[in-house]
C-alpha cells in the first residue's frame, strides 16, 4: 500500500521577553503547499496537541530559538530524549557547536511504519533573515513589525495587527520553501541540496569514482591544510581615518575557482620527505617544519591555529624563533615561499593528487545561466546553489552532537552525546578550492601593495580612486571570477578584521540611490561593518566614537530559562 506524501508546514512562535515569565504567547502554522490551510492561536498546549497528531514535517525559521520551547514542553509532558526511536520519545540533531537541525518526535508505530512529526530549521535551507527572504525572493508578502516587549498575560487575545504579522511570517517561509521544493531542493540544508544537485548532474556512480571516501586517518591529515578566507588589515591603516578609497570584490569567488582551476580527484598517494614533481599527480599537500620571516614589502599569508605560541586569527610576520609545524597545499606553500624567507626547513611527508579542470563546469554553467536569466526567488536559489557546494566537500566527519535535558532549575541544559562519525565527502577538494580563492585575493592585493588597506575573503579595499593595473582588464559587475567595483568611499576607518566604517559616494538613478563616484555623487551613505554588532547598535556609531573600547549594552543574548529562551540585553564591546 502506497502512503500519502507527508504534509509540510511553516511554523512560528511569538514569545514573552521576561526571564521570570518565559512562554509562547502566539503560534502560527501554514501548509507549505496550500496557504489557505493555516492557524494562528495563543496556546502552546494547543499547538503541541496538533504537532503530536499531525504526522508532518514542520519548519521553524531559527529552530535553535523556537525548538527550546518545544523541548521544554516535551520534557514536561512525559517525553524523553532517545536515539532509538522508541514510542513517546524525541530525538535531535544538535551539533557540538550548538547548531540545531532537527527534532523528531516519535509517537509509536503502525506495523513497521513510524508515527512521528519531524521539525526542521528552515534557516539551514534559507540562511537569511525573514525580511531579506521576502525582499530578495520578491514574494507577495513583506515582513512587518510588532512591539516585542508589550505586556501579554496568559490568555492574551491576539490583536488584528499581530495576527497579520504572524500570518505574514509563516507565509513568507512557506512561499520560499515551496519554491525550493518545486526545484527538487528537498534536503535538510542548502549545502546538502547543492551536493545532491551536483551528484544529479555527474551521477552518483561517477561521483564515487572521482571522489573516493578517504579513511578518517587520511582525512585528518588532509584537513590540517584546510583554511578559510583571507581576512587581513594592513597595520599601516589600523585605527586611522583614511581618505578616499575603493572596494572591489570577486564575482562568485569560490565557484570561479571551481570552474577554472586545477583541482584534485581520486585516491592520494602518501610520500615521505619533499614532493618531487609528478605529472600524473601534479597537486600536493606538504607537511613541513620551518622558521620564517616576512620579506620587506610583502603581505603576510600564514596563520597558525591551535598553537600556544601564536594568535589563531593573526597573519604572522615571523615565526618568533619557534619552529612552526605546517600542512600546506602546494598553492599555499608557493605563496609562502614568495612572501617569506624560510629557514631550517624540514620536509616531513605529504599527499599527492591527480588533478583536472572542469569537474564543476556543467553544474556551474547550469546555475549561472539560471541566475543570470531569472529574477527574485529563482535567482536567489541559484546563488545559494552556487555558493553552498564547496563547503560541503570539507564537512567534518566528527558529527558528535549535543543532547538536551532539563536541569534542576527547569531550564534546558546540553551534554555531549556519544562520539559519532560519518564518512568524509572529499576534503582535498575543499582544501584546494579555498587555497585558490586565497591565492586570487592575495596576489591581487600584493600587486597593489602601496595602496592595500584591507582584504576580506573575496574583496580588496584600496586607497585612491583609480582602478589598479592588475585588475583593470578583469573588472565587470557580473562575469564569473571578474572583479566588480563595489563602491568608492570618501573616508573610512578600519579597526580590525571585519570591523570598519565608510562614507560611501552615492548617486540617484531612476529614483534609487546607487554607488557613485567623487565626480557624480549626490549623497553620502554611512556604512558600518562590524562582526557581532546589531543594527540597533550600528545606529549609535559615528566616526568620532568608532574605536577600540566602544561599548553598548544593547546586544540581545539568548539565555535558556524555565519554559524556553529569553533574549537579555548583553554588552557589546569592540576589543
Curated annotation (Swiss-Prot):
Pfam families documented for this protein: DNA_pol_B_2 (PF03175)
PROSITE patterns found in the cross-reference section: DNA_POLYMERASE_B
Effect upon mutating residue 15 to I: 95% loss of ssDNA-binding. Decreased in fidelity of DNA replication
UniProt effect for mutating residue 226 to F: Favored polymerization (high pol/exo ratio). decrease in forward and reverse rates of translocation. Increased affinity for dNTP and for pyrophosphate in the pre-translocation state
Outcome of substituting residue 192 to N: Loss of DNA-binding. No effect on TP binding. 50% loss of replication/amplification
Motif annotated as YCDTD, chain positions: 454-458
Residues the record marks as site: Involved in binding template-primer structures: 93
Function statement: Polymerase responsible for protein-primed viral DNA replication by strand displacement with high processivity and fidelity.
Note: This DNA polymerase requires a protein as a primer.
Name used for this protein in its record: DNA polymerase
Amino acid at each position: 500500500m502506497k502512503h500519502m506524501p507527508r504534509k509540510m508546514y511553516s511554523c512560528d512562535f511569538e514569545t514573552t521577553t521576561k526571564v521570570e515569565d518565559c512562554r509562547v504567547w502566539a503560534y502560527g502554522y501554514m501548509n507549505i503547499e496550500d496557504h489557505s490551510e493555516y492557524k494562528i492561536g495563543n496556546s502552546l498546549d494547543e499547538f503541541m496537541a496538533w504537532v503530536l497528531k499531525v504526522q508532518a514535517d514542520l519548519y521553524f525559521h531559527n529552530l535553535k530559538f523556537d525548538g527550546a520551547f518545544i523541548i521544554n514542553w516535551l520534557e514536561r509532558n512525559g517525553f524523553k530524549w532517545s536515539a532509538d526511536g522508541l514510542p513517546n520519545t524525541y530525538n535531535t540533531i544538535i551539533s557540538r557547536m550548538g547548531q540545531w537541525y532537527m527534532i523528531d518526535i516519535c509517537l509509536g508505530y503502525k506495523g513497521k511504519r513510524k508515527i512521528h512529526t519531524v521539525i526542521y530549521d528552515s534557516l539551514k535551507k534559507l540562511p537569511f533573515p525573514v525580511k531579506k527572504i521576502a525582499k530578495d525572493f520578491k514574494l507577495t508578502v513583506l515582513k512587518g513589525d510588532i512591539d516585542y516587549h508589550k505586556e501579554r498575560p496568559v490568555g492574551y487575545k491576539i490583536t488584528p495587527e499581530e495576527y497579520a504579522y504572524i500570518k505574514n511570517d509563516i507565509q513568507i517561509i512557506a512561499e520560499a520553501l515551496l519554491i525550493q521544493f518545486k526545484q527538487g531542493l528537498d534536503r535538510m540544508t542548502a549545502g546538502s541540496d547543492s551536493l545532491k544537485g551536483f551528484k544529479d548532474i555527474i551521477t552518483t556512480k561517477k561521483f564515487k569514482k572521482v571522489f573516493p571516501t578517504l579513511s578518517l586517518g587520511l582525512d585528518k591529515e588532509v584537513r590540517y591544510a584546510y583554511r578559510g578566507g583571507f581576512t587581513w588589515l594592513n597595520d599601516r591603516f589600523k585605527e586611522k581615518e583614511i581618505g578616499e578609497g575603493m572596494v572591489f570584490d570577486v564575482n562568485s569567488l569560490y565557484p570561479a575557482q571551481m570552474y577554472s582551476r586545477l583541482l584534485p580527484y581520486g585516491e592520494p598517494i602518501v610520500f615521505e620527505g619533499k614532493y618531487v614533481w609528478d605529472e600524473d599527480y601534479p597537486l600536493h599537500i606538504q607537511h613541513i617544519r620551518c622558521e620564517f620571516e616576512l620579506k620587506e614589502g610583502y603581505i603576510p599569508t600564514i596563520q597558525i591555529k591551535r598553537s600556544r605560541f601564536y594568535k589563531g586569527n593573526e597573519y604572522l610576520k615571523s615565526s618568533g624563533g619557534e619552529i612552526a609545524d605546517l600542512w600546506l597545499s602546494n598553492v599555499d606553500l608557493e605563496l609562502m615561499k614568495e612572501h617569506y624567507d624560510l629557514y631550517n626547513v624540514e620536509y616531513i611527508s605529504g599527499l599527492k593528487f591527480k588533478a583536472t579542470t572542469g569537474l564543476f563546469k556543467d553544474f556551474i554553467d547550469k546555475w549561472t545561466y539560471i541566475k543570470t536569466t531569472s529574477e527574485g526567488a529563482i535567482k536567489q536559489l541559484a546563488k545559494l546553489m552556487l555558493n553552498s557546494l564547496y563547503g560541503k566537500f570539507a564537512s567534518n566527519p566528527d558529527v558528535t552532537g549535543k543532547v538536551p535535558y532539563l536541569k534542576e532549575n527547569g531550564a534546558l541544559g546540553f551534554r555531549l552525546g556519544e562520539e559519532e562519525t560519518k564518512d568524509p565527502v572529499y576534503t582535498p577538494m575543499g582544501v584546494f578550492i579555498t587555497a585558490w580563492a586565497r591565492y586570487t585575493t592575495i596576489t591581487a592585493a600584493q600587486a597593489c601593495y602601496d595602496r592595500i588597506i584591507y582584504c576580506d575573503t573575496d574583496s580588496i579595499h584600496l586607497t585612491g580612486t583609480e582602478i589598479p593595473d592588475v585588475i583593470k582588464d578583469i573588472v565587470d559587475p557580473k562575469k564569473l571570477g571578474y572583479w566588480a567595483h563595489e563602491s568608492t568611499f570618501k573616508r573610512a576607518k578600519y579597526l580590525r578584521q571585519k570591523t570598519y566604517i565608510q562614507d560611501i559616494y552615492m548617486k540617484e538613478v531612476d529614483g534609487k540611490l546607487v554607488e557613485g563616484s567623487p565626480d557624480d555623487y549626490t549623497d553620502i551613505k554611512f556604512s558600518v561593518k562590524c562582526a557581532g554588532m546589531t543594527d540597533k547598535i550600528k545606529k549609535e556609531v559615528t566616526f568620532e566614537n568608532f574605536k577600540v573600547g566602544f561599548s553598548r549594552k544593547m546586544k540581545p543574548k539568548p539565555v535558556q530559562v524555565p519554559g524556553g529562551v529569553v533574549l537579555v540585553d548583553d554588552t557589546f564591546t569592540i576589543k
